[in-house]
A protein has these predicted regions:
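Phosphate-binding loop of NTP-binding sites
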Residues: 91-199
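N-terminal leader/targeting and accessory segments in enzymes
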Residues: 1-94, 98
Length: 199
């Protein structure tokens, strides 16, 4: 990742730093929400899901070599550095928005009721003939997947093709706040997701 320090992260997500201040200028190597994919000096983001609260994995993650972790609660017995935040999900979105701004590369945003993925693949295929292009992988197109896609960007990437999907009111506003696309592609607007969006 490009020059993201623990100090940057603490400030961007309005967090509270718990740890040795000498570490604040250390740069992280990556950001992950997956406790099984820990690389040395990464930042771990524990997400509270419907069935699993990833805070339980923090001790193991830190033992595997993570530089620090976020936490939605105070960890009084922690022997490792962490940033306490109100919401891990909101923090990861704030960090993604900040990181993308630092890279200053063009963004193509793609959305629509159907056809997003195939359109993304076609656009990325054309762009990669001339530019180093990063595209959304799989279904990483929601409020967690989009930030994780952004974190895959490197300094030598020249353009990002980001798929954005919604299932609730206000979600597109939150996604575009992160991506701030320079070019937008809307494949179509149909009757998908009406179970959450209504008529």
């Amino acid at each position: 990742m490009k020059n993201l320090t623990l100090r940057n992260l603490t400030e961007v997500c309005s967090g509270t730093w718990h740890g040795d201040d000498a570490l604040l200028d250390r740069e992280i190597s990556a950001i992950t929400t997956d406790s099984r994919k820990i690389e040395k000096d990464c930042l771990f983001v524990p997400i509270v899901g419907e069935r699993v609260d990833a805070h339980r994995f923090i001790p193991d993650v830190m033992a595997k070599g993570a530089l620090a972790t976020l936490s939605e609660r105070e960890l009084p017995d922690a022997a490792y550095p962490y940033i306490q935040v109100a919401s891990s999900l909101q923090a990861v979105k704030d960090i993604a928005e900040f990181y993308l701004q630092q890279l200053q590369i063009p963004v193509v945003g793609i959305t629509g009721s159907v056809g997003k993925t195939s359109t993304k693949e076609v656009i990325a295929s054309v762009l990669k003939e001339k530019y180093r292009t990063l595209k959304t992988q799989g279904n990483f197109n929601n409020e967690l997947g989009l930030p994780l896609t952004v974190f895959r960007l490197r300094e030598d990437d020249q353009i990002a093709v980001l798929e954005m999907g919604i299932s609730d009111f206000g979600e597109m506003t939150r996604l575009t706040r992160i991506a701030k696309p320079d070019t937008c592609v809307i494949t179509n607007i149909g009757t998908c997701h009406l179970e959450n969006l209504g008529d």
